[in-house]
Amino acid sequence: KPDSTLNLRFIQGNRMAHKEKFSNRWGVIMAMAGSAIGLGNIWRFPYMVGEHGGAAFIVLYILATVFVSLPIFVAEVILGRKSRTSAVYSMTSLRPDQRIWKYAGYLAVFIPLVICSYYSVIGGWSMDFMFKTFSGTFVRSSTDEVMNLFSGLTGSFWKPVGMHLLFLGACCFIVMNGVKTGIEKFSRWSIPVLFILIVVMIAYSLTLPGARGGMEYLIKPDFSQITPKSFAYAMGQSFYSLSLGMGAIVTYGAYVS
């Protein structure tokens, strides 16, 4: 009882005292989309589709998203909105008398830390290639030449470290500017740009050799390739796509008016 009372008072004292919240629903959607759309969708999802029956895996993924992931997503938003506090103490607010929820909150914070450990490295690589793109380095460059540039980047020490720190610095700058002028403002223009880039990638991929066969494989489900692991992969991909269990959606929910 004393522990639960202390936890409850701590939660109440640490509710988001700020007045800053997302300005409107569009800002919330863009910020949450920025959290959800990532390497798991661009790199991992096509590989999973190719390994598990094409459209058959997409059907499993859609079912997992609609019937499992979306309800959990809504629950995380509601939890954050109701508690108005961090991911850790949002979990603790469920049952202040049971410490397991506090540990679940700490786990929800630890998971993004692990993800950030490699996302930030890849983010540094991306920034280096972005600078090369703007400087015209890739103009008329062959695939082998681009691969050599990447090998040179990863083979050195200081340049990846510098790009890594630059990427982390940019992230910190955005977060330090707050929800409305930082995360929301950045998401409002970066997510549409990301959408345009994805459309360009799709259009370009359709011009590559074997595109017709790939499209046929994509729209014709092959359920014979579905295994028990396929269900687990589809569920995991669905969770990853919506940033579930990582504290991000709970935290964003705390800033929803």
Language-model-detected regions and their locations in the chain:
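Alpha-helical transmembrane segments and their helix-start/interface "positive-inside/aromatic belt" motifs
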Residues: 54-62, 99-117, 184-194
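Hydrophobic alpha-helical transmembrane segments of multi-pass membrane proteins
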Residues: 30-36, 62-67, 107-118, 166-173, ...
